[in-house]
């Protein structure tokens, strides 16, 4: 039966189900980021998504999960289990569940061998199973790997889309092949346009109060998502055309930005670091870092952005007092009088880095990340941040709290320091 006809009969079932396959996921050895990413993508497309399941590399339990999905969902999306090893069982289990023979796709096997050869690997006989698919399945090409997926309608009203477990491969296949297919066959009568606004320095509850009326409206919808150091609002508009959907979305976007001011730092794939670097690039200015408790986290965030070298010159990880003295010029008296975690020292770190490394701006961070090392006067979670620029130095202490843990305190310090520089740049300092 043609795929389009099968999807037309899908009204008996509801929604999309995600099935993530892999014992490493079940045991918690690997974070299941695929399910979260796919859920956001489905929401952006306007496809109802009601269930997520994780199952290990076990034929019977995988088969049971698939057959359960048949009765309640019209689309099943699977990730994982498409590799060449014996515990990669997805394709053959799906075929067995619906009593459908596997057929080799010779052109696909040739392509897999070519990819392995180009990558300096020798194709093994085990890789040949990656060219086996149930009769009638449509191939989902994998541009980056040797594990293609498929779109298959084994029963009327039920479609399976399979993807490899490698997130980068799955995302590329989803965007290039699956989304166009879903728009054509997935029952999407309307076009959905989505935009993600990013906020920092404001709590989710406070943000929700500021935009409460917009959160309650129907089209576009506005949904909040909280993360470490930031809050996101996803705006999703529905229209007969892309242009119509954007006409609905843009005024809500503008209203949200107007109400929240500097708390909104960017949208979609923008990061705080990329926004800061763009602002510096527009001004023709440079930045360096001097880090203690963050251990290079601020520099790493900046260096992760393409073209960062145009404005990010480098930095110093001054963890010990001796390094602070030798590389940043911090005086012994200042350290003895105030301690490394203090306003005077972090200011001196920022000014020392800016002058010695020859940049327009510098960020300095010093704090108590824990779990030990805190005192009554300087508890775990206390972080001093300073940003030095052409017209002076702006410094402030932040108390992130002992309960957050070391890594969270470090990450929050990175976010806060980048945001401090962003605000100064926008202020015209």
Swiss-Prot record:
Name of one Pfam family that matches: CinA_KH
Record InterPro entries: CinA (IPR050101), CinA-like_C (IPR036653), CinA_C (IPR008136), CinA_KH (IPR041424), Competence-induced_CinA (IPR008135), MoaB/Mog-like_dom_sf (IPR036425), MoaB/Mog_dom (IPR001453)
Family: Belongs to the CinA family.
PANTHER family: NICOTINAMIDE-NUCLEOTIDE AMIDOHYDROLASE PNCC, NMN AMIDOHYDROLASE-LIKE PROTEIN YFAY
HAMAP family named in the record: CinA_B
Name of the protein in its database record: CinA-like protein
């Amino acid at each position: 039966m043609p795929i389009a006809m099968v999807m037309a009969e899908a009204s008996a079932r509801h929604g999309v189900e995600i099935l993530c396959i892999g014992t490493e996921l079940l045991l918690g050895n690997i974070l299941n980021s695929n399910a979260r990413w796919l859920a956001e993508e489905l929401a952006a497309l306007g496809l109802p998504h009601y269930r997520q399941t994780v199952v290990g590399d076990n034929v019977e339990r995988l088969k049971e999960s698939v057959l359960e999905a048949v009765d309640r969902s019209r689309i099943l999306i699977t990730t994982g289990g498409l590799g060449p090893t014996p515990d990669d069982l997805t394709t053959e289990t799906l075929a067995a569940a619906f009593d459908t023979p596997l057929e080799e796709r010779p052109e696909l096997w040739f392509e897999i061998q070519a990819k392995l050869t180009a990558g300096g690997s020798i194709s093994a006989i085990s890789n040949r199973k990656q060219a086996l698919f149930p009769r009638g399945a449509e191939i989902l090409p994998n541009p980056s790997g040797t594990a293609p997926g498929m779109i298959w309608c084994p029963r009327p009203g039920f479609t399976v889309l399979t993807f490899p477990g490698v997130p980068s491969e799955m995302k590329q296949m989803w965007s290039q092949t699956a989304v166009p297919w879903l728009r054509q066959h997935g029952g999407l009568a309307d076009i959905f346009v989505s935009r993600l606004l990013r906020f920092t320095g404001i709590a989710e509850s406070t943000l929700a109060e500021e935009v409460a009326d917009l959160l309650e409206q129907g089209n576009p919808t506005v949904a909040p998502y909280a993360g470490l150091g930031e809050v996101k609002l996803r705006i999703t508009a529905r229209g007969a055309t892309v242009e119509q959907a954007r006409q609905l979305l843009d005024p809500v976007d503008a209203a949200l930005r107007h109400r929240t001011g500097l708390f909104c730092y960017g949208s979609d794939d923008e990061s705080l670091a990329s926004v800061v670097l763009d602002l510096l690039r527009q001004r023709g200015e440079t930045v360096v870092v001097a880090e203690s408790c963050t251990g290079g986290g601020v520099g790493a965030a900046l260096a992760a952005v393409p073209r960062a070298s145009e404005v990010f010159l480098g930095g110093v990880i001054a963890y010990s007092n001796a390094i602070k003295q030798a590389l940043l010029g911090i005086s012994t008296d200042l350290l003895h009088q105030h301690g490394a975690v203090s306003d005077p020292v972090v200011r001196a770190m920022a000014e020392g880095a800016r002058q010695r490394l020859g940049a327009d701006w510098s960020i300095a961070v010093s704090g108590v990340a824990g779990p030990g090392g805190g005192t009554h006067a300087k508890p775990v979670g206390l972080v001093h941040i300073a940003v030095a620029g052409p017209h002076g130095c702006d410094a402030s202490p932040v108390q992130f709290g002992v309960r957050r843990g070391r890594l969270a305190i470090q990450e929050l310090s990175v976010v806060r320091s980048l945001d401090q520089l962003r605000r100064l740049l926008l202020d015209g300092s």
